[in-house]
Amino acid sequence: MAALTIATGTGNWFSALALGVTLLKCLLIPTYHSTDFEVHRNWLAITHSLPISQWYYEATSEWTLDYPPFFAWFEYILSHVAKYFDQEMLNVHNLNYSSSRTLLFQRFSVIFMDVLFVYAVRECCKCIDGKKVGKELTEKPKFILSVLLLWNFGLLIVDHIHFQYNGFLFGLMLLSIARLFQKRHMEGAFLFAVLLHFKHIYLYVAPAYGVYLLRSYCFTANKPDGSIRWKSFSFVRVISLGLVVFLVSALSLGPFLALNQLPQVFSRLFPFKRGLCHAYWAPNFWALYNALDKVLSVIGLKLKFLDPNNIPKASMTSGLVQQFQHTVLPSVTPLATLICTLIAILPSIFCLWFKPQGPRGFLRCLTLCALSSFMFGWHVHEKAILLAILPMSLLSVGKAGDASIFLILTTTGHYSLFPLLFTAPELPIKILLMLLFTIYSISSLKTLFRKEKPLFNWMETFYLLGLGPLEVCCEFVFPFTSWKVKYPFIPLLLTSVYCAVGITYAWFKLYVSVLIDSAIGKTKKQ
């Protein structure tokens, strides 16, 4: 707090927040890391040791390169720094290699790349409406947003304990959003195009970008009622946008097109042979669907409606990533999830087209695209919830309704990440960090909107408080029961299903809010 006090007086409070979280990241260096640590070490080795023609074919390790080319080049650049730390980490055949120098290099590379995220957060803070400015520094929307983003619990544990490089990728996304708020549309489009070629999961929010840029940049004027003035369409602008996307894509995919390897690259990026859900079900609609199928199958067996010999052998809770058949409900195909996702996204896209509401409307649409894809996508990872939580953070300091949705989404979504850290030493760390972040989020947003109605109703409060007993049950009670051996998947099942309820509720509540705002806007115009 001393650093923050000094920073308040000099106006450098943002630097103090950034420095503080960086020190925390350094303290987390010795903690547990997941298999993703080996994944990225292997990618360093592949890009450093092999010619580009072999990058997307190399399969010595099961952790093959399955990110777009820009990320592969990023690993290539890192590898030329890594060789000064430990040359052995760059050997393709050194599977599961993890020396102390390798650990330090990979951990510090994540921390260093977060510089882009810090800069993007600063740019986003410049876009925040300053109407609700409190007397105290800690009550200012910009300060609250800075803490919500820089100290985001999910990003901390996923990148700096579990191990991934999400920080600088989200930095690109937030910087792109900031540029659109600043009406620097070409820069925003360029940054997002670059981002897509770093990690293709951001395709989930591409519809929001495409529609917003077409509606608000390529059409230069509206009619008095807010509808499109078709004659204002600018061919120059749409060609400029197309050229930006084309050039970025050509730079990324061009070398592999020249090598006639695009089919191989895309087969790595989109492995549809994986199952509907990850080993640990992401808390989405399909988790509820799978749970219902399990319940119906148990009831069917008890009532002898089902033949035990006809029950599929592949278990959805076995911890294996595989395809499986549902027992009672219809099995779900990749095409079915795509259709469900498109149907879920369309209403928000229509609202953005017919009632743009400026950059804020774009941001709400982007969040809904991210959430809808999380809810209905194929083989969704639990970490993908951050794609909705981070942009929702920007909305949370603007309106009380959005703050309420954000708190439900972020608390539930962050808790759903707990199974990523399953080792005993990390248990107190994840509980303490989440408690601190959650308490701060709720208290700061309640203070910001203290003149408005309470952020939670009794049902929402009861649900969020239920996460406490759930954690006690899963971590401290279940391990001492006889069910631990026979039903080891129950804690994961309970966590996934319970969190799926909260995330589904937040998604539905945000959708209702967007549709109502759109309808009210049309009524006012009339």
UniProtKB/Swiss-Prot annotation:
Changing residue 47 to P: In CDG1H; decreased dolichyl pyrophosphate Glc1Man9GlcNAc2 alpha-1,3-glucosyltransferase activity. GO terms for cellular component: endoplasmic reticulum membrane; lumenal side of endoplasmic reticulum membrane. It catalyses: an alpha-D-Glc-(1->3)-alpha-D-Man-(1->2)-alpha-D-Man-(1->2)-alpha-D-Man-(1->3)-[alpha-D-Man-(1->2)-alpha-D-Man-(1->3)-[alpha-D-Man-(1->2)-alpha-D-Man-(1->6)]-alpha-D-Man-(1->6)]-beta-D-Man-(1->4)-beta-D-GlcNAc-(1->4)-alpha-D-GlcNAc-diphospho-di-trans,poly-cis-dolichol + a di-trans,poly-cis-dolichyl beta-D-glucosyl phosphate = an alpha-D-Glc-(1->3)-alpha-D-Glc-(1->3)-alpha-D-Man-(1->2)-alpha-D-Man-(1->2)-alpha-D-Man-(1->3)-[alpha-D-Man-(1->2)-alpha-D-Man-(1->3)-[alpha-D-Man-(1->2)-alpha-D-Man-(1->6)]-alpha-D-Man-(1->6)]-beta-D-Man-(1->4)-beta-D-GlcNAc-(1->4)-alpha-D-GlcNAc-diphospho-di-trans,poly-cis-dolichol + a di-trans,poly-cis-dolichyl phosphate + H(+). InterPro entries: Glyco_trans_ALG6/ALG8 (IPR004856). GO terms for molecular function: dolichyl pyrophosphate Glc1Man9GlcNAc2 alpha-1,3-glucosyltransferase activity; dolichyl-phosphate-glucose-glycolipid alpha-glucosyltransferase activity. The keyword Transmembrane applies. Pathway: Protein modification; protein glycosylation. Its main location: endoplasmic reticulum. It is found in: Endoplasmic reticulum membrane. GO terms for biological process: dolichol-linked oligosaccharide biosynthetic process; protein N-linked glycosylation; protein N-linked glycosylation via asparagine. Keywords: Congenital disorder of glycosylation, Disease variant, Endoplasmic reticulum, Glycosyltransferase, Membrane, Transferase, Transmembrane, Transmembrane helix. It is linked to Congenital disorder of glycosylation 1H: A form of congenital disorder of glycosylation, a multisystem disorder caused by a defect in glycoprotein biosynthesis and characterized by under-glycosylated serum glycoproteins. Congenital disorders of glycosylation result in a wide variety of clinical features, such as defects in the nervous system development, psychomotor retardation, dysmorphic features, hypotonia, coagulation disorders, and immunodeficiency. Polycystic liver disease 3 with or without kidney cysts: A form of polycystic liver disease, an autosomal dominant hepatobiliary disease characterized by overgrowth of biliary epithelium and supportive connective tissue, resulting in multiple liver cysts. PCLD3 patients may also develop kidney cysts that usually do not result in clinically significant renal disease. Belongs to the ALG6/ALG8 glucosyltransferase family. Dolichyl pyrophosphate Glc1Man9GlcNAc2 alpha-1,3-glucosyltransferase that operates in the biosynthetic pathway of dolichol-linked oligosaccharides, the glycan precursors employed in protein asparagine (N)-glycosylation. The assembly of dolichol-linked oligosaccharides begins on the cytosolic side of the endoplasmic reticulum membrane and finishes in its lumen. The sequential addition of sugars to dolichol pyrophosphate produces dolichol-linked oligosaccharides containing fourteen sugars, including two GlcNAcs, nine mannoses and three glucoses. This is Dolichyl pyrophosphate Glc1Man9GlcNAc2 alpha-1,3-glucosyltransferase. It comes from Homo sapiens. The lineage of its organism: Eukaryota, Metazoa, Chordata, Craniata, Vertebrata.
